[in-house]
Amino acid sequence: MNESHEAGKNSSTNVEEREEEVLRLARQFTEQSSYSTAGQTPFAAEAGSALDPNGERFNARAWCKAMLQMHIGDKEAHPLRTLGVAFSNLNVHGFGSDTDYQKSVGNVWLKTLSLARIAFGQKQRKVDILQNLEGLVEAGEMLVVLGPPGSGCSTFLKTIAGETYGFHVDKNSNINFQGIAKQMAHEFRGEAIYTAEVDVHFPKLTVGDTLYFAARARTPRHIPGGVNATQYAGHMRDVIMAMFGISHTKNTIVGNDFIRGVSGGERKRVSIAEACLSNAPLQCWDNSTRGLDSANAIEFCKTLRMQADINGTTACVSLYQAPQAAYDYFDKVLVLYEGREIYFGPTSMAKHYFLQMGFVCPDRQTDADFLTSMTSHLERVVQPGYEDRVPRTPDEFAARWKASPQRAQLMQHIKSYNAKFALDGEYLDKFKQSRRAQQAKAQRVSSPYTLSYVQQVKLCLWRGYQRLKADPSVTISSLFGNTIISLVIASIFYNLKADTSTFFQRGALLFFAVLMNALGCGLEMLTLYAQRGIIEKHSRYALYHPSAEAFSSMIMDLPYKILNAITSNIVLYFMTNLRRAPGAFFFFVFTSFILTLTMSMFFRSMASLSRSLVQVLPFSAVLLLGLSMYTGFAIPTGYMLGWARWIAYINPISYGFESLMINEFHNRDFPCMDYVPSGPGYTDVGLNNRVCSTVRSVPGQAFVNGNAYIESAYSYTASHKWRNIGVIFAYMFLLGAVYLVATDFITEKKPKGEILVFPRGHKALKKGKSDEDLEGGGGRSATVEKIGSDGLAMIERQTAIFQWKDVCFDIKIGKENCRILDHVDGWVKPGILTALMGVSGAGKTTLLDVLATRTTMGIISGEMLVDGQPRDESFQRKTGYAQQQDLHLSTATVREALEFSALLRQSAHVPRQEKIDYVTEVIKLLDMTEYADAVIGVPGEGLNVEQRKRLTIGVELAARPQLLLFLDEPTSGLDSQTSWAILDLLDKLKKNGQAILCTIHQPSAMLFQRFDRLLFLQAGGRTVYFGEIGQNSQILIDYFVRNGAPPCPPDANPAEWMLDVIGAAPGSHTSINWFETWRRSPEYARVQEHLAELKHERRHQTNLFRTTSGQKREDKDSYREFAAPFWAQLYQVQVRVFQQIWRSPTYINSKTALCVLSALFVGFSLFHTPNTIQGLQNQMFGIFMLLTLFGQLIQQIMPHFVAQRALYEVRDRPAKTYSWKAFLIANIVVELPWNSLMSVLMFLCWYYPIGLYRNAEPTDAVHLRGTQMWLMIWTFLLFSSTFAHFMIAAFDAAENAGNLGNLLFLLCLLFCGVLATPDQLPRFWIFMYRVSPFTYLVSGMLSVGISNTNVTCADNEYLRFDPVNGTCGEYMGSYMSNLGGYLADEMATANCSFCPIKETNVFLGRVSSSYSDIWRNFGLMWVFIVFNIFAACSLYWWVRVPRDKKPVAKAE
């Protein structure tokens, strides 16, 4: 190890001395650099020099030294600061139980009882996570934390970094951050950071932009070197990318599991680089080498070491499968065993501590693996004679440590440290001064952030613009959709006449315009939830306030909202002939725009106040109903019930609607177009004896005053016009403030932790062997025996040989072709375990995908044969493919997942019981009996990483693959014990004749030795070696040494050595072209000869077998795409989907709350509405508002479906488990029973409160019409669910499908006959009235609800006039006999009170509805439902079902 590392190992406990040493070394390093950097600054480095991050000779250590020297030489730069930590009596606990039952629709109410008991004082059971931990990590030191999954490594790192959500740190615990304690969690949050194992980034943002943003967010106030902040951040980005070997990905999007971007290993390095750019003096890394190859894992630790030596950074790192070279970089090690500390001290002494105790370290086992093996009775090896003297249980190990002299020495060091760095003492002031000097001048002293709030907003604006450029689809589709809707609305109400005949139409137009502008931002909620985890991570790094991102997104959306307001409203205003006055037009656009902003704040605040989307949807639906119903149009103010009138007062939309109505009607006189009485016999009647047929008309006037009309019909006052604008502004600022504050303080829902959960009634089986058992001396042999011969007799023995030759894979990036795989050759034989290795991004996973026929893009060339024959349609189902991502249905149990795979992927000729028995054997083989009935859960909850990986392999084994087994990174993210157990399993499968090809990262020497053959790829997908590994890797080593590689040291790991040899490790170089060396080697020639032999021999044997056995190529059972027939697939998938829905109470409860609360709200808002003219209109709008639930119903289904589809398309479809038809039909059918139940609840909660049943009483048809109403509601819900599947079938994102769905939904609403009757529609649009499903819903529901009963006018609905002579009855007799209506008093001789409508059927006729059409309407709804199902299936097949892609002919 280099000198600086040794200095780190023997660092003084005196922090001031350490800082002086750092300064001295910086000066010395600058003078003695092995690279000539004299006269250069890092920011002005000569191209190609050691300080140029874009050059090939870049040297990270030289750059760090130069950077530190420049910093020290600048008197204005902020003082350097370091941070160590001492902890003692550290206890961490949670509440609950080790096992919990799975929530379902049937038992979720029990959780409510449990919460009630807790609320009334019942204590929860305390679960200890960490117990009595003690340790000291000084500034500039590195601590490695070792332990198997579940030992508390993550909890320890989170505790040190101050992220204690979900658990509790005991109040008596002592943590001293070099004189700082309570301030660390808030004031200095970004100074101690925790980097989680999961990679969370904006997937459409490029790597370069992602890292530039992180660098810019932590840019200090004064930058040494004379560069500005932009240059500094750009340079830091380039440096960190060069350090971690990802410079080539600068312009590539980051991507995620579902959006293709950089490779998994590169994405992990992006996460590491982003955290490093925070420049935190104390860094906690949780298994951050997961997914990295050995070379990059070592380089990561080397970079941390360099930071520690030069900058005094403190690093605490948990590692699984740590290479020896990586372990050697650390100063201290903490070993955890089920939350107990069993060792803390120097790494160099840890191994000796346990050897002295009586344990044995096997040859070639790394120190880290040896230390971790102490936590498993199956792994640790005891010296002969020590069997009764070594500790066995966690408590015994902890007690041995407590009594050790090493622990006594540690406690003395902690005591000295605490005495030197007293809490809230001198060092706290120094730390604050250093932070203050780094912060922007406008930033608060106590803030954890570096930039000022304004700077944060500007930076987030820059990122928002980059994101918009990368993916403008949602914005463009929203703008396009809104413009189309505006054009449609404008064409429906085209060129309205300026007379009384258009009063209702003008109100309806303004109502719809207000809703369109106000509610068009609803989908913003989905976007906010999608990015919430990323923003919270950045907040933990103290990059920016979440509210700064929120504020910037508000600004970022302004151009779109302004453009949308202009384009939509100009079209709407002038095409419909609204008030032609400049002031009125600009007021209309202005009001619409501020309503859009206000409601955007409403939706955003709703999203920020809740912790998950499922929580907020039902309540937002009711709120939207309230906002829509209480605008003043659907229910005029006079008809609002007393208990609900306040809703209008707190409704911003109601103020906007009132202002727009005043804007349109104020001080205008509208000519009368229809008089009462009129027609034959009344032509000579004067104005004094007839009246305009409009509310608030005055006898003797040929016009109606606009002010009088809106005052009588809506209770609106002209003086409120500008007052309302002020109220809307107040709401905008209030809701905006709520949004910003809630964003900063309310976090998203976090995982509960990896605790086993079982279906209610199932219990965990106890372990067969416990840690209390006596120690044996055999160590790993116990594992081998444990998964020994059980069930192996049933494992399918394979005979087929799979071979490939000259396999190439090309994809198009931009206009250029990029070759990912370059002429790769190889084979896999039964009984042979082949490793596929290479650096990150070398194409390992791509090669597996190509060989397994799982690519959906690109051009494949080359030859791939099974027993000398081309792969047929059944190849995918006959191979097992254990993917790197452990993707499983979260609600299923382990046993159910295995049985599902066995029932659908094993041959249809195998009896069902045999398949079930086979699953039981697989469970035993994989040692999963203990949790066979446990629920899988989502990552972070349920099964842990190891259990998920076993399940992933088990699912493939349960399928009984006839050909071979592919495994992609089966040991990634696992500790050494579990990795060894996985290899034990693979070894057993191999010995039973399984053919296995397995990619692997970070194998230890012992792990690597267990493979038989190696296919080694370098960058660009080029073969470096394919052949046997040999005893102690000797054949492999001899090949490389013979071709110019330096000898492999005896204690080196050959897997790491060969990466260095070919120049694949960061910082390593080679002059040898190993690809060309391989192509010229005798080994390559032998491979080609053997491939030719295999092709000829196996093809001959296969043809001979077919001839002698009578087997024909047309054998459908052997060669068909799926093992199970379609109806068997549909049955199994349907059962699983029903189980999933039943076990998703949140989804069902959300659906129930949405339907029930909305129905109750509408029902009681219109409680027992009278049958006045306005009352009938209110009842019609009661139906209309119920239909507006459609948008929320499909929004609930779409995200749920997208998650299921992602699982199917990534795992089940490539494995040919079942067809897309079974998947789609099952997901559509599963909604049927729930929609039936919801329809009953909705019917009861809506139909009876409104009082529609009373209208059936006169005809004695209460039961019949009630049943008919329920049937119409039922078809509405069925139509909604099938329409949601129709919309989402082709789209990737629920947002885009939601935009299109909302567009079509609005069209259905517009043309249903409520806002504009068929007679009022332009002839061009009459076809839309006929094809809108809501036409038949409204017609059916309205006719069932109000037909065949009488109307009683309200007082303001009577038209009053004087007769010419005689009584009112005599005067109006002729008119009433022709046009209907009735008089309040036929015998009156003056002031006749005439009601224009006598029967509800007249009202129905005006909206083209008739009760006689009810069954026609019901039947047509079923036509629409069937069409949705057919369209969903057709679209899915056309857009998402991959077409057969045959490899092209062999190409050079």
Curated annotation (Swiss-Prot):
<feature type="glycosylation site" description="N-linked (GlcNAc...) asparagine">
    <location>
        <position position="2"/>
    </location>
</feature>
<keyword id="KW-0472">Membrane</keyword>
<feature type="glycosylation site" description="N-linked (GlcNAc...) asparagine">
    <location>
        <position position="1391"/>
    </location>
</feature>
<dbReference type="GO" id="GO:0016887">
    <property type="term" value="F:ATP hydrolysis activity"/>
</dbReference>
<dbReference type="GO" id="GO:0016020">
    <property type="term" value="C:membrane"/>
</dbReference>
<feature type="glycosylation site" description="N-linked (GlcNAc...) asparagine">
    <location>
        <position position="1365"/>
    </location>
</feature>
<feature type="glycosylation site" description="N-linked (GlcNAc...) asparagine">
    <location>
        <position position="1350"/>
    </location>
</feature>
<dbReference type="Pfam" id="PF00005">
    <property type="entry name" value="ABC_tran"/>
</dbReference>
<keyword id="KW-0677">Repeat</keyword>
<feature type="domain" description="ABC transporter 1">
    <location>
        <begin position="110"/>
        <end position="363"/>
    </location>
</feature>
<dbReference type="Pfam" id="PF06422">
    <property type="entry name" value="PDR_CDR"/>
</dbReference>
<dbReference type="Pfam" id="PF01061">
    <property type="entry name" value="ABC2_membrane"/>
</dbReference>
<dbReference type="GO" id="GO:0140359">
    <property type="term" value="F:ABC-type transporter activity"/>
</dbReference>
<feature type="transmembrane region" description="Helical">
    <location>
        <begin position="474"/>
        <end position="494"/>
    </location>
</feature>
<protein>
    <recommendedName>
        <fullName>ABC multidrug transporter A</fullName>
    </recommendedName>
</protein>
<feature type="binding site">
    <location>
        <begin position="838"/>
        <end position="845"/>
    </location>
    <ligand>
        <name>ATP</name>
    </ligand>
</feature>
<dbReference type="InterPro" id="IPR003439">
    <property type="entry name" value="ABC_transporter-like_ATP-bd"/>
</dbReference>
<feature type="transmembrane region" description="Helical">
    <location>
        <begin position="1418"/>
        <end position="1438"/>
    </location>
</feature>
<dbReference type="InterPro" id="IPR027417">
    <property type="entry name" value="P-loop_NTPase"/>
</dbReference>
<feature type="region of interest" description="Disordered">
    <location>
        <begin position="1"/>
        <end position="20"/>
    </location>
</feature>
<feature type="transmembrane region" description="Helical">
    <location>
        <begin position="1297"/>
        <end position="1317"/>
    </location>
</feature>
<feature type="transmembrane region" description="Helical">
    <location>
        <begin position="616"/>
        <end position="636"/>
    </location>
</feature>
<feature type="glycosylation site" description="N-linked (GlcNAc...) asparagine">
    <location>
        <position position="10"/>
    </location>
</feature>
<feature type="glycosylation site" description="N-linked (GlcNAc...) asparagine">
    <location>
        <position position="287"/>
    </location>
</feature>
<feature type="glycosylation site" description="N-linked (GlcNAc...) asparagine">
    <location>
        <position position="228"/>
    </location>
</feature>
<feature type="transmembrane region" description="Helical">
    <location>
        <begin position="1153"/>
        <end position="1173"/>
    </location>
</feature>
<feature type="transmembrane region" description="Helical">
    <location>
        <begin position="1183"/>
        <end position="1203"/>
    </location>
</feature>
<feature type="domain" description="ABC transporter 2">
    <location>
        <begin position="802"/>
        <end position="1044"/>
    </location>
</feature>
<feature type="glycosylation site" description="N-linked (GlcNAc...) asparagine">
    <location>
        <position position="311"/>
    </location>
</feature>
<dbReference type="InterPro" id="IPR034003">
    <property type="entry name" value="ABCG_PDR_2"/>
</dbReference>
<feature type="transmembrane region" description="Helical">
    <location>
        <begin position="1223"/>
        <end position="1243"/>
    </location>
</feature>
<dbReference type="InterPro" id="IPR029481">
    <property type="entry name" value="ABC_trans_N"/>
</dbReference>
<keyword id="KW-0325">Glycoprotein</keyword>
<feature type="transmembrane region" description="Helical">
    <location>
        <begin position="1271"/>
        <end position="1291"/>
    </location>
</feature>
<feature type="transmembrane region" description="Helical">
    <location>
        <begin position="725"/>
        <end position="745"/>
    </location>
</feature>
<feature type="transmembrane region" description="Helical">
    <location>
        <begin position="554"/>
        <end position="574"/>
    </location>
</feature>
<comment type="similarity">
    <text>Belongs to the ABC transporter superfamily. ABCG family. PDR (TC 3.A.1.205) subfamily.</text>
</comment>
<keyword id="KW-0547">Nucleotide-binding</keyword>
<dbReference type="InterPro" id="IPR013525">
    <property type="entry name" value="ABC2_TM"/>
</dbReference>
<dbReference type="Pfam" id="PF14510">
    <property type="entry name" value="ABC_trans_N"/>
</dbReference>
<dbReference type="GO" id="GO:0005524">
    <property type="term" value="F:ATP binding"/>
</dbReference>
<comment type="function">
    <text>ABC transporter that seems not to be involved in the efflux of toxic substances, at least not the classical compounds such as itraconazole, amphotericin B, voriconazole, posaconazole, ravuconazole, or echinocandins.</text>
</comment>
